[in-house]
Amino acid sequence: MTEKISLLVVQSNPVVGNIAFNKQIVIDHLQNNNSDLILFSELMLTGYPPEDLILKPAFMKKVHEAVDEIVNLSKGKHPTVVLGTPWLDEGNLFNAAVVIH
């Protein structure tokens, strides 16, 4: 028996520094799609290149809050989301792929 996986690769144009706008793109795809897996690009939430924005604690706090909101909205939904975003962990900054399932 062959099982199929439905995959959506989102090629969008995130706006540099506009976390709210970029987050809404993610939410819209999450809420309006029946795929098993949704893949977003590198630095989806911050836009590219974020340059010195990612060095500002208030900006990174907004990134973490946006990821938390997406996680909460995805609870009970089927798609797994892979989201490219900068991630600050214990003072270390990473160019990360966050998997939300």
Mark where each language-model region is:
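Hydrophobic structural segments
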Residues: 1-101
